[in-house]
Amino acid sequence: MNKTRTVKINMLFIGVVIVFFCFIIIKLSYVSLSNVVNKKDLKAFASSRNTAKETLIASRGSIYDKTGEILARNVNSYTVIAYLEPTRTTDNSNPQHVVDKELTASTLSPLINMTKEKIMEMLKSSAYQVELGPGGRGITELLKEEIESKDLPGISFTKSIKRYYPKSDFLSYTLGYAKTDEKTEIDGEMGIELFYNDKLSGTNGYKEYQQDMFGYQIASTKPIIKKAIDGNNIYLTIDTNIQMFVEQEMEFLERTKMDWANITVMNAKTGEILGSASSPSFNPNTKNISSYYDPFVSFTYEPGSTMKMFSFLAAMENKLYDGKELYTSGSIKIDKYTIEDWNKKGWGDITYDEGFAGSSNVAAAKLSQKLGKEKLREFYEKLGFGYKTGITLPNEQEGNISFKYEVETANAAFGQGLTITPVQMMQAASCIANDGDVIKPYIVDKITDDKGKVIFTGKKEILNKAASKENTDYMKRLMKTVVDGSVKTAYAMNYNVPEFDLIGKTGTAEIAGTTGSYLTGTYNYIRSFTGMFPGNNPEIIFYIVVSKPTNLTAVPTVTKSLVKSIGTYLNLNSSSTKNTPDKKVLSYINKETNWVKEELINKELNPIIIGNGDKIIQQYPNKGAVLNKNDKVFLLTSSSEYKYIDILSWSKKDVSSLFKLMDMTYEEEGYGYVTSYSYKLDDVINKEDKIKIIYKPLYEIKKESTN
């Protein structure tokens, strides 16, 4: 009985074992054939554990001015590292850690703009290594090399990529800035960098490969690579020389106490923005930003009497204007409100033409009564007020022209009770400069892909026909009387620049306070000037607006200086002092150096001879250029070697011309005129040399020379 029971148990055990092994065999067969266990693909799981994938970061595109001068680009960036652990040093003759903390701190302090005490505090850390920030973060290659030349034991660097703006605080709000995120990608945060972030960023690629247990690529395997597509390059309509003039005038305004300001210059014929600066500004390399909004497109304000250009023009277009008609100036009562001229006593009975020259609020108010709110608003809308212009800059505002009652309409006729932006003023003024055509402002000249192919071209865009040539010509004559003193009521003769035939209109606007009433006091106004020149056929439109300036002559001072700088640069002088044909540049290629030098001196031009060769092989400017007296002509000779020359006090334009002719790159800082450079005079030029040039505004140079 027991024996039989034992046999049954054994057979049962054997059966269980057989079933178990059958199950295992079936399971293994299933796994080997399907690669799936518990709904998990084992093949994919194993592959993922052995496969590494690296992101290939696309290089961000650069931003240039219209001529190809670089305004924003990627550069190698370095962070200063101090190794503190003594065990890093295995050979005392070649220490690999910081040995002399005192010497290291005192040497680095002026170089990375940190106090010696702060650096000493960091060097006394018990850590293996420390990062010397903030001053030692994001330094340039030039500064890295200067630190390396000090041979400080234990000082090293980590490398990264950062966005660099070679001109520092220059066109800052337009360019904006971009910063590196935690994934080492660079993203735009303001300005063009933000608006065109997708186009500048490009498309990242990747590298996928099989790795061993230590994370290294297995040599016998072939990686899968999808190359990154670098970002597009953006060329702005900005003329760097005109931008420099604008920046210099903004520097002057900033030395006076004010709230904010904007100066913008536009090509009257095309709508290209040639220069624009706002204050308070910032350096996009250091991001010392007090406001993230650009006044040019984002600030709305009541503009004041510059709007009389458009309310008077509206009356002309509606056949309601007779410039010789008399009216009583001084004040007018509308409903229960009294509107006064700035000259509260008025000028007596004067014509409407005289009222425009004197910036009479009463004249504008009476014209608004003839027009009515609908016709005035309709004309303002034709010019683009109340709508975004669509310029390709972020955070553009549309302003407000929702006047309703008769007194509000009167206020709107002289620029109160409605709000605009500077870019809207530029667009509206284009109507007067272009025989009634409203031209859309634009700031991007072209966009190229990573291969240099042009994929977008900016162009002139006529939005509508808002006025007739007859009426805009009339308005230009009125704007001339504002500044030339030819009419008894004119008061803005301190704006007059007769050699460039400037015309324009002043503006003084009250500022609304937080309580709803207007601010009081001598300086609580927005002062502005809309100008264009030459008056009979404008090439340039500009707008200067300053909030709460304490220097009441600042706007006319800046206006005259800006017009003279731009007019001379663009050769728009309307007087007899214009360049004559003997200032025209010829082709000097293959001519004898001495003969060319004498020829240019006789033309009262300034030859800059590069090298000691007896023949000219390259020149700039090229044949046909018309120059002003004492302008430089750069001549590259047939020399076996070239030596550095003195460029102190040169303008950025001249420096750029020289280095372009030499086919060399350089780093620059600041703007204005050259005050120092990194090379030694008469050293032989090596195209691989790293050159740095420092500029300062003229007023700073003059101030330093008198100290």
Ranges and model annotations:
Residues 109-113, 152, 179, 201, ...:
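Sec-exported extracytoplasmic/periplasmic mature domains
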Residues 499, 544-549, 554-556, 560-707:
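Ligand-recognition elements built from short beta-strands and adjacent flexible loops
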